[in-house]
Amino acid sequence: MIRFQPITTSDVQHYKFMEELLVESFPPEEYRELEHLREYTDRIGNFHNNIIFDDDLPIGFITYWDFDEFYYVEHFATNPALRNGGYGKRTLEHLCEFLKRPIVLEVESPVEEMAKRRINFYQRHGFTLWEKDYYQPPYKEEIGRASCR
């Protein structure tokens, strides 16, 4: 059964799992400096950092913001060794049951094949693509903004 377990940096084993998976799963321009992420995790009340478990097996992580009217998912990744096993689908189902307000996800523009695959995955699971381009402010000062939808 899928469940989310909130973590802080004091949960060393799980936090290390999350950080390593983040770095492995996303290019550097798509996540903030790790020291800033640690601060957000420990000190920002509406930022939620969770390990995704299937029973007792950690399978991934998800971070999201609670903005009162909606939730904004910042990062979601599963262990590469476990991908294509239905965990993404089951995690999204759990997410939609767990969070009772609208959920906003962000994906890069559908230019590259992986971006198209991500978009199709989310659409297959009930999410709608906003067909307007916009630019996300950079997570890191030295890296430019990213084109997203």
Language model: regions and residue ranges:
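Conserved N-terminal entry element of GNAT/NAT acetyltransferase domains
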Residues: M1-Q13
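Active-site rim helix/loop that mediates acceptor-substrate recognition in acyltransferases
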Residues: F26-D54
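Conserved beta-strand in the GNAT
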Residues: N49-I51, D56-A77
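Conserved acetyl-CoA-binding loop-helix of GNAT-fold acetyltransferases
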Residues: T78, N84-E97
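Short glycine/proline-centered loop/turn elements that form peptide/ligand docking sites
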Residues: L92, K116-R118, Y135-E141
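Conserved GNAT acetyl-CoA-binding A-motif
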Residues: L99-E113
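Conserved active-site alpha-helix within GNAT-family acetyltransferase domains
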Residues: S109-K132
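Conserved small/polar residues in nucleotide/adenosyl-binding loops
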Residues: A146-C148
